[in-house]
Amino acid sequence: MNTNKATATYLKSIMLPETGPASIPDDITERHILKQETSSYNLEVSESGSGILVCFPGAPGSRIGAHYRWNANQTGLEFDQWLETSQDLKKAFNYGRLISRKYDIQSSTLPAGLYALNGTLNAATFEGSLSEVESLTYNSLMSLTTNPQDKVNNQLVTKGVTVLNLPTGFDKPYVRLEDETPQGLQSMNGAKMRCTAAIAPRRYEIDLPSQRLPPVPATGTLTTLYEGNADIVNSTTVTGDINFSLAEQPANETKFDFQLDFMGLDNDVPVVTVVSSVLATNDNYRGVSAKMTQSIPTENITKPITRVKLSYKINQQTAIGNVATLGTMGPTTVSFSSGNGNVPGVLRPITLVAYEKMTPLSILTVAGVSNYESYPNPELLKNMVTRYGKYDPEGLNYAKMILSHREELDIRTVWRTEEYKERTRVFNEITDFSSDLPTSKAWGWRDIVRGIRKVAAPVLSTLFPMAAPLIGMADQFIGDLTKTNAAGGRYHSMAAGGRHKDVLESWASGGPDGKFSRALKNRLESANYEEVELPPPSKGVIVPVVHTVKSAPGEAFGSLAIIIPGEYPELLDANQQVLSHFANDTGSVWGIGEDIPFEGDNMCYTALPLKEIKRNGNIVVEKIFAGPIMGPSAQLGLSLLVNDIEDGVPRMVFTGEIADDEETIIPICGVDIKAIAAHEPGLPLIGNQPGVDEEVRNTSLAAHLIQTGTLPVQRAKGSNKRIKYLGELMASNASGMDEELQRLLNATMARAKEVQDAEIYKLLKLMAWTRKNDLTDHMYEWSKEDPDALKFGKLISTPPKHPEKPKGPDQHHAQEARATRISLDAVRAGADFATPEWVALNNYRGPSPGQFKYYLITGREPEPGDEYEDYIKQPIVKPTDMNKIRRLANSVYGLPHQEPAPEEFYDAVAAVFAQNGGRGPDQDQMQDLRELARQMKRRPRNADAPRRTRAPAEPAPPGRSRFTPSGDNAEV
């Protein structure tokens, strides 16, 4: 993990392999290079239009899959080709291990003369091997697993599926890639030697019983001894000993041929055959042995092997009746080992992608990317820089914990390609520790990821604290407006598996002929919640926005927008960064999806999604997923802002449509939805709508006043009269208005202005309380049954009293609560064994350091009360073997013919031994000691200090070096 950028690079490479490789941060710190390999195949569809792709997403070598086609009548498979990386890794690298891999499988190419692509895809990940799959038909593929994260069904071939390699474990070894070793000049032409993939081989043994061989029907006809499943994709070594005896002396020399056939999925034609022959004669018929010893290179395995068959035949008719009995000279076995067969990912798990009903001769495209840690061969190593792997427990544990919660986070091995692309932003957030996870919140994952961060990477979580979100109660913005708030506060509309697509595809309502209309605008995937608090603007206007859903045209919800002077495109989501212009190029506005039909004031404005207006005038705006604002209410707001509003932001929401004469406000529909959005922050809606009988659910008193026409915005003659009404409503003291209208307006703006009517204020609070607790329907039904409120009055005449403060729990319950609390803290720290019962037995104490260390090392539950002091490193104050310290100190301080080390240097060496628990210094400490010795030697000597005397050096014993050759003047 790169702590400078606070990015979990290993996890990012797993989730988004196309971003490049990243070293696996485990404790294998071998030198390596990072290598990314691509795979690209255009597979031609057969006449049947059906086939299957066998993918090995975790294979550490170059072979990543195979392609089969169904025959014309779909009764049998036909092998087409292997799927491999673009470079054969064993040509340049000796060792390697896989970091991550991804495939994209889809069709977008038509054969000549056709105009439509047909066909669907089914994909499933199977935890077993290929030979264990019972049926490979299109329909039966979905029965391989019940895990929804591991299968996709009936996906159009034009949409495609994505196969993602999720590690099944993190103890990945470096495997030999079957590279060829350098050969001598005298080697036979074509002869070569390779290092086989022999790490964790998968070994199969065929044990034959000590019984008579089944009789053959005729000479030269094979009789089966054993047939079964086996999975092989790499080089294989075969060994065997089949011994038997004949009941009678053979009349003629009889040849026994024992044949081991390796076969694939598609037919009974052997891929590789191993044969062992032996002659039974008069001399050996009491004990005949056929030996099998053969190596099969990877090149000879031309397709995946899933079956083996052992059989035999004879060449003499007279020997058919001569009974042969196995096991005369010992066990009869045939074994074969597949290289790297038990390395995770080589043979299991597999992902099967079946296609059906595709257009014959169309093209199925397979595009993959694989990331490796590789060690180059000696020739390549001369020109490449290798680097040590770095152990990063935080990065590794973070990846482990994220992937262990794959069900909760909906991380899959197979995806619909469009869904995988939707998750790209979320994956980038999860791997970025400096991110506050705004998109992850939209998917309902933020709490899980934050909890994992606190446990797996507490240091980085401290260095890069999450920005305190302003959202909190802001969940009401979407949750309340769409009526989808969950009981826990998270809105269902953005939950994984909920109506997130409807919300993400929402559009601001507007004219279909606008240049940024829904039909023309190309949506960007976005669900990024960011909130910014701005100081009070010089002026502004608030307008409602009605969002419609593309997939459900009848559904809609509302929100608010504030239009202020200035250019603030950085505060808009990517979908809203649209610049429109007033008529005759007299100004512009960001965030409006259509040009303004009237002239402006040569200024630039920005329409921002509004979250809240605070008491001090500050405004809180947010980035949301909707598209640019469109519609007549936005045009009305701009007209007011350009022509009438000179200072401040009116605490109300304006709606209406400007007529063609630009002097009249005509009625507009959708006021009920807009009222809900306006009353959420406590603002009244000022506007006009056709009809006065519509009822608005869950709104404040202002909605009723608007619907009944109490706050009119009627047709008027001339813009001055029109502006007169709106301008007076905007003023803090609306002089000139009707006295009754002024009183009603002030009462309904109790939350936006100072409270002037206590009864209306209580009524508004009561309505908010009823809505908050979801009692509106119940209260309405009660009002119909009890119109005079007789029963209800008796029920609520006496409000509930707070009971007396209860006494504290007794000692038993207090100890149980304490044990539960200690257990929760211990489990969060990683001590899963610390149940409340265990804590109680441990004298109501959490795990000690020794107990926790014992659990980490052995994986077993420690005994309560046992401190396991042997598992705690005991500090050693000072070693007792001072002779060892003095020898090392003299050796480090100087050569034998130099002066001995001073006492201060002895103390420094002793401190190192004490720090290391009795062990000697490591490389860094040795370097520090040498530097200390050089500093001590450079100290100026006092004239009065006598020079230390030392014994004269002993002369070297006579004799010659053992490296000097014999002779007088010989050269070395």
Curated annotation (Swiss-Prot):
The annotated active site, in chain numbering, is: 633 (nucleophile), 674
In what ranges is there compositional bias, type Basic and acidic residues?
801-817
Q: Protease: present as a keyword of the record? A: yes
Q: Where does a divalent metal cation bind?
A: 26
The UniProt regions of compositional bias labelled Polar residues, in chain numbering, are: 963-972
**Chain positions of site Cleavage:** 442-443, 486-487, 495-496, 508-509, 715-716, 734-735
- Give residue ranges for domain Peptidase S50: 509-734
What are the alphabetically sorted keywords of the record?
Capsid protein, Host cytoplasm, Hydrolase, Metal-binding, Protease, Serine protease, T=13 icosahedral capsid protein, Virion
Q: What's the protein here called?
A: Structural polyprotein
Q: Which organism is it from?
A: Infectious pancreatic necrosis virus (strain N1)
Kindly list the organism's lineage: Viruses, Riboviria, Orthornavirae, Birnaviridae, Aquabirnavirus
